[in-house]
Amino acid sequence: MVVTAHLDHLGVNTTGQGAPYYAGAMDNGAGVASVLEIAREMAAAKVKPKRSVLFVLVTAEEKGLLGSKYFAGKPSVPPASVVANLNMDMALPLWKFDSVLIYGIDESTMGDTAKAAAKLANLEVVADPYPDRNSFIRSDQYSFIRAGIPALSFKFGFKADTDRAAIEKAWRAERYHALADDLSQPVEKAEAVKFDAFLAQLITDVANEPATPQWKDTSFFKRFAN
């Protein structure tokens, strides 16, 4: 299985005003940090998962998923051995991690594993509050989906018309693809640690499943596996 996050953001600020570059702390420095920390913890663990796990940091997501598209098409391992993708992109650790939003949770058997892991961690699994955004196909997981590989992506949970939704809306208005997405913004670091622990457990659970993840018969995306 492959765990991904994108390294790139928007690059140099050419306006002559403000910071000289776009830091991209949430999009996607936080995702990269999660992948690195989970990789470190899993590499140090005495008990290894039954299935190998590749941690891959890709580039040019903001230019059209170019890095992940290349890797999904020409992986560093035999293509048939890539059976799942978990992608970290803009999880937004801005509030307590007591619920999780998982894009693609109803599309493959991996979603059932994710639900079980969330239950064990006392996390509520919330539905996508804005399905019209089509978030499941708007980050690097889509490159793997197009290659027929089941995938998931994650955010701190929130529901529409709540205080958390208002925070998310304000973040998008003020910081998304803006110079303000930098290290000066408030971050719930202790909650981010809990998020990483949940993901590490889920990765381990998926890697230890005797059967490889499969698209559900009801999933639109199953057509890419044929």
Which residue stretches match the model-derived regions?
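Extracytoplasmic/secreted envelope proteins and their assembly/folding machinery
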Residues: V32, L36-A39, K50, L65-A72, ...
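Short connector loops/turns at beta-strand edges and beta->alpha or beta->beta junctions
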Residues: H6-V12, D89-P93, R172-Y176
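His/Asp/Glu-rich mid-to-C-terminal helical/loop segments that flank catalytic regions of hydrolases
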Residues: A33, R40, A44, K155-A225
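Sec-exported extracytoplasmic/periplasmic mature domains
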Residues: E37-V47, G73-V77, K115, K119-L123, ...
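Catalytic-core environment of secreted peptidases
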Residues: M1-V56
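Soluble non-cytosolic domains of exported or imported proteins
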Residues: A25-A33, V47, E62-L66, G104-S108, ...
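Short beta-alpha connecting loops at secondary-structure transitions
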Residues: P20-Y21, W95-Y103, Y176-E188
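Metal-dependent peptidase/peptidase-like ectodomains
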Residues: V58-I167
